Every structure is written in C-alpha cells, then in structure tokens.
C-alpha cells in the first residue's frame, strides 16, 4: 500500500470555532522549504489532510475507533449494543445511555467528536489559505485542482458534522474572528455542502479512490458523486430546520440543479448513482471480498480508509472490541468481549429459522466458535458458544453474561495483525457501490418508480430470493447488506423509526418529537460562544 505523507504543520486549532484556541506542536522546519514547489505544496497542504480520515485515538477518525462517529451511528440503533456484562462495560453508564438515547450536552465523547470534525475543517481552511498564498509557484491548473480537492475534503467533514449536530457554523476562512462566527441552520449547511461538491466535482480526478496508486485514499469525483447521492437521499431530513414539529418537505418538492437540469431529490439521487455505474463500479461477485485483508482492488468499494499495519497507526477496533477474550486469544491476540448484534438484528437475518440469510455467517460469529476448525474452550472447560438470543442490555445477572450476543464479523481476520488485532491490513470501507444500488432502489420507490432491479441485484449476489421493492423491504435489506458499516442511525431517521421502541429500548419522554435525531451542541461550545443556540429538546 502507498504511504500517505505524514507531516507536522504549525496551525492554530480553533476548537468549536470560538475563543478556545489550542496550538498544534510548532514545526521546526523552514516554512518556505515546506512550500517551495508544487509537489511539496500538495504533500503538505492537501495530502496531509488525509492523515485525519482514520485514527488510533478515541472519538477520532471517520471509522475504526471507539466512542466516535461510528459508535453514535451504530450503538444508538436497533442494530447493535454494548451490554453491561457484570463488572465489564458499565463505564459510568456510557453504553447503556447511548443505546437508550440518554445523552446530553455534557457528553465528553460528543464534544470530542465535534472537536475532531472541526479540527479537520479548520486545517482545510488553512490549506486553502496556503495554496492561495503560494499560487505563484503553481500553474493555474494545479491551483484549481489542489483547491478543489481540499474543498471536497472539507465538505466531507461538514457532511458528518451536519448529520450529527444539525446546526453548525459555516466558516470558510482560516483567519476568521470570533465575532464573525455564527451558527447556521441545518438547511444552510446542507446547501453549502451540496454547492461545494457540485462546484468542485468536475475538477476532481475521475479515478477510483480505493485502488492502490496515485489516487489511493483520496477524495476523487466518484467519492463526491456518492456523497451527493447520499445528500439527495436524505434531503427531506437535512432541509428540515425544526425536526421536532412533525413537518418536513417531500423529496419530490426539493429541487437540485444537476448539470443544468432541475431534478427533485429522488431524481438527483438516482442520477448520481447512475454516474457511479458509468464510472465503472459494480458489485463484486463475492460479498465478503469487499472486506478481505487485501481489499484494495475491490470493484465495489468507492472510498476507504487505507490501513497497513506496517505503515500506519490507524486502527480498526470493532472485531477486537466484540469478540470474547478466548476468541481473540485463539488468533494470537486479545479481545474485549463487548459489542454484539441485537436480537432483532439476528432475527432479521433469519437466525433460528430454516431461512437464514446467506450473509449471516459472514457478518456475525454465532453459536459454537471454531478457529481453524477447532473449538475454543473457556476457563471452565466448556466450549465457547455465543448465544445470539440471550442478549440483554444488562447481563449482570444472566447465566450468559460472557457469551450472550452474536459478535461482529464482516471483515476477514488478519492473522498477522498487530496490537491485539486492531492494526490490520483490511482497508475500512466507508462508501461502496452496493449501498449506491440500495439508494437508487429507494429513491425510485419514493419517486413512484420501480426499484426492483437494483434491490434484487443485491439479493442475487448472495443467492437470496427476490422480494418486492417497497420501503419496508428496502429498509430491511439495508440492514442485511450494510450491517456494521455505520449507516443504521441515518437510515432509521429517514424511515421515521429511530425514536421508536426496539430491543429493550423505551422511547424517552417527548422523544416522539424527534429531538434525539440530532445530537446536542456540546455545552463547552455554548459556553465559549454565546451566539450558539442549543438544539431542540436539549435546552
């Protein structure tokens, strides 16, 4: 795998876009040497931003670590939970509160997520300033292309910030002053992201980002097209500035300008999904190959976090966090015996019936665990048997407190992994074409069209029978196909299911208003910038 250039760059880090200013370590290198030619400007002002896509620090990275974006999009849903197992996994009520939607503005992990997202946004603004101030060393084409790529990265991070926090500040200048910073409505942030991506997409390389080479791990045109499809699919949500009043626009009445044509949200989503098909993406014949140790040549994966245990410190925690201690030990490392699938999730896969979905064994460890064809034995001499249907949010008094719940699978085990299985060679899949097909199917159905071709292409790939293309089946298929990929919260919100009761979760008082579909603005940010208003329901 190609190395993504590492760098240390002096930069005032304006966390929360407030007077809270931290400074990154000062670089001892001569600034003029760092930016003395086009190659160095690209490495240190553009490529350097990709250092932050993944991480080995809690609450940082778009995926791979714990207590961050992925956990708040997965462990707050009917897909998965991190149950209390006696003396393990209470953690001050963190995981139980996450599952029960009992977070608040003082949640330190939400604050850390906010800091992470805006750190990269601030650094992107700095990079744009650097490119502009050194454009005499660049050709007009280089200035255009470098600027476009940085703006696309910034839009990507604004997308995650908007999706989680709704009303966030739009700041595009590196030298902004506190009195200039205001909080934008969610619809304004949505429009900003769409406009940015549509504006820069023609300047982005029309290359496959997941493949090794010059564009490996970068935001290319297909990445922008996928993100635009995702934005259009969720336009009803993102254009709603008061998500607690029970009203929102219909996607058929939300319009985009797409290549000079006026299209509604669903037509826009379909158009961008079709662009991905034209760009050469297709389903892999083997579903599991997208998550193999060496998955960098997948024809289906669109955007990934490149991992290489010999080059990067970035980590993938989810297998390590989920497997029983003895299970991890059988691979020569360790594990934390934590997260697992909810009962409703394994039942959706048909577990316990004669009609188990063919993706079940790829996505989960269940029943008697075998490694290299051999059973794993617990300290009491009994074989390790995961019990998917015995899961409870608090297992402290359960006979199965150590073994309840089907565990995270999906990614092939890297048998040469470092750090107890957290540093691996499997690239982390963020965007893939299988999701695009399901988005296209959903958009067609919502637009009054037939989405059966796209929906059943997904099922054909794994040898499952065709189903009718309706919204219920599409939501279920998104769980079956995309489990453990970090999309469930967004899907449940879009389908109006996120605030309802499921798997030992009772809705909070007033949660029917939808206030928990957006996380609170961290209190530290409110304290530092009095112009900010708290999100609805958390006042």
Residue spans for each PLM region:
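Short, surface-exposed recognition loops and adjoining beta-strand edges that mediate ligand/DNA contacts
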Residues: 32, 60-82, 174, 204-223, ...
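Membrane-proximal, proline-rich intrinsically disordered regions
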Residues: 20-74, 103, 249-250, 525-539
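Long, intrinsically disordered, low-complexity segments
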Residues: 20-21, 117-120, 192-194, 215, ...
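Conserved, well-structured interaction surfaces
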Residues: 38-47, 51-61, 85-165, 178-191, ...
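Flexible, polar/acidic helix-loop-strand segments at domain edges
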Residues: 90-102, 351-431
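Glycine-rich, aromatic-lined ligand/substrate-binding cores of catalytic
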Residues: 55, 286, 290-294, 298-392, ...
């Amino acid at each position: 795998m190609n190395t993504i250039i590492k760098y240390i760059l002096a930069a005032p880090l304006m966390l929360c876009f407030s007077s809270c200013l931290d400074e990154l370590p000062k670089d001892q290198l001569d600034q003029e040497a760092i930016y003395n030619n086009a190659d160095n400007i690209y490495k240190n002002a553009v490529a350097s931003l990709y250092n932050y896509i993944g991480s080995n620090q809690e609450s940082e990275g778009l995926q791979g670590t714990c207590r961050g974006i992925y956990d708040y999009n997965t462990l707050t849903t009917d897909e998965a939970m991190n149950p209390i197992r006696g003396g393990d996994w209470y953690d001050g009520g963190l995981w139980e509160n996450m599952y029960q939607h009992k977070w608040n503005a003082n949640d330190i992990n939400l604050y850390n997520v906010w800091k992470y997202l805006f750190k990269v946004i601030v650094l992107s603004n700095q990079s744009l300033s650097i490119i502009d101030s050194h454009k005499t060393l660049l050709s007009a084409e280089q200035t255009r292309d470098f600027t476009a790529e940085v703006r696309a990265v910034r839009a990507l991070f604004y997308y995650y910030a908007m999706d989680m926090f709704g009303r966030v500040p739009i700041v595009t200048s590196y030298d902004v002053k506190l009195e200039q910073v205001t909080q934008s409505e969610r619809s304004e942030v949505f429009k900003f992201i769409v406009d940015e991506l549509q504006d820069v997409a023609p300047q982005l390389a029309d290359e496959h980002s997941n493949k090794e080479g010059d564009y490996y791990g970068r935001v290319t045109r297909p990445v922008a097209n996928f993100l635009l499809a995702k934005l259009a699919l969720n336009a009803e949500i993102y254009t709603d500035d008061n998500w607690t009043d029970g009203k929102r626009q219909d996607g058929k009445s939300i319009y985009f300008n797409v290549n000079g044509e006026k299209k509604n949200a669903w037509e826009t989503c379909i158009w961008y999904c079709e662009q991905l098909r034209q760009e050469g993406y297709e389903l892999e014949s083997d579903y599991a190959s997208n998550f193999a140790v060496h998955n960098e040549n997948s024809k289906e994966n669109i955007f990934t976090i490149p991992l290489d245990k010999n080059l990067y410190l970035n980590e993938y925690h989810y297998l390590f966090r989920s497997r029983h201690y003895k299970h991890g030990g059988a691979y020569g490392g360790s594990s934390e015996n934590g997260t697992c699938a909810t009962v409703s999730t394994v039942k959706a896969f048909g577990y316990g019936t004669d009609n188990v979905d063919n993706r079940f064994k790829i996505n989960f460890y269940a029943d008697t665990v075998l490694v290299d064809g051999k059973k794993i034995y617990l300290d009491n001499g009994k074989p390790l048997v995961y019990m998917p249907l015995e899961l409870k949010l608090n297992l402290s008094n359960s006979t199965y407190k150590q073994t309840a719940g089907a565990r995270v699978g999906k990614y092939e085990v890297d048998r040469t992994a470092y750090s107890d299985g957290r540093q691996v060679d499997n690239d982390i899949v963020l965007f893939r074409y299988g999701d695009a097909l399901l988005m296209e199917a959903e958009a067609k159905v919502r637009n009054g069209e037939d989405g059966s071709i796209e929906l059943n292409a997904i099922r054909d790939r794994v040898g499952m029978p065709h189903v009718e293309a309706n919204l219920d089946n599409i939501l279920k298929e998104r769980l079956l196909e995309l489990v453990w990929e970090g999309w469930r919260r967004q899907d449940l919100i879009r389908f109006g299911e996120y605030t309802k009761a499921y798997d030992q979760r009772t809705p909070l008082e007033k949660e029917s208003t939808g206030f928990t579909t957006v996380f609170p603005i961290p209190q530290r940010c409110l304290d530092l910038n009095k112009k900010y208003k708290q999100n609805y329901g958390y006042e």
